[in-house]
Each structure stands twice: as structure tokens, then as C-alpha cells.
Amino acid sequence: MDKFSELGSIAWLWTNSELHQNWPLSLFSTNVIPAIETQQYVLLVRDGMPIAYCSWARLNLETEVKYINDVTSLKLEDWQSGDRYWFIDWIAPFGDSYLLTKHMRKLFSDGLFRAIRVDAGSPNGKISEFYGRNVDAKLAMQSFEQYQKELMNALSQQDNFIISTSK
């Protein structure tokens, strides 16, 4: 499949995703075109029809902070700026998320990933963590804790960042 056909298939999945269908075209351009250009995506097809899509970026800490503050901020050069893996899009509007999960855990069997997860209709997101099938769970948690410390330290250097603690 050529790039334009793949772009059309991904657009079709976006329009069928409850979460993505009302997002602006500018975000589609920001999230999808760099993924295709850097070949950092998976498009699952069944019987000639696209059923799921996932894209990822390899960010450095500085770009990660920029992304946390503004998910629309990634430029093409940011997608391969470091070794901190982030899922950018995860779209499986027809119930094939498990199949996509299985595929990604095999493709990145030794990988550690994070993602900003947003529920449909919510303006808020949260950071979720994922690891490949060959990664020891305890080691993954230690690595994620280290990532979190580095990220919190970098975020705390910003003027507009406030750390709140619950009691």
C-alpha cells in the first residue's frame, strides 16, 4: 500500500473512532503524517479493510516535556529525537484493540512505552505505561519510576508547574 492509501485508511479509522472523530484535521496532520514519514506506525488490515492503527515516537526528555505540556507540539524531527518511547495514537474502533495489543507486544517485545490516554468526551488525559512481553514486570516498574522522576524534575523547572500532593 502506498503512503496516500495508508493515509486514507488511517483517516477512515479516525472517523470511526469515538475519541478521534471530532478532533481537528490539524491534529490528524500533526499525529499521522510524521508517523508515516518516519515509518513509526502499524496499520492492521483484515480482508482489505483497515481495523486498527498505532503510531509511536521516540522522544528525548526535552521533547517529552514539550509533548506533556502540549500534545500538538511534536514536529517531524521530534519523532526520532531520543529513546523514550510514546504511543501517539492507538485506534481500534471495531473492537480489535486486543489484536493490536498482541501485535505491539510482539513487535516491541523488549520495549517500554508510555502514552497519554484520554477518554472520549474528557478534556483530561493521564499517562499510562506499557511494556513488551519479554520485559520483567518488576524491572519495567523500576524503569518507569526512573522515567517519572526525570520527567517530574524537568517539569518542575518550568515556571507554570505546580506539584500538588494528596494527604
UniProtKB/Swiss-Prot annotation:
Keyword Transferase in record: yes
A GO term from the CC aspect: cytoplasm
Keyword DNA damage: no
Alphabetical list of InterPro entries matching this protein: RTX_toxin-activating_protC_bac (IPR003996)
One Pfam family matching this protein: HlyC
Keywords: Acyltransferase, Cytoplasm, Transferase, Virulence
Cellular localisation: Cytoplasm
Record function comment: Protein-lysine myristoyltransferase that catalyzes myristoylation of the protoxin (RtxA) at two internal lysine residues, thereby converting it to the active toxin.
Family of this protein: Belongs to the RTX toxin acyltransferase family.
Protein name, per record: Protein-lysine myristoyltransferase RtxC
Organism: Kingella kingae
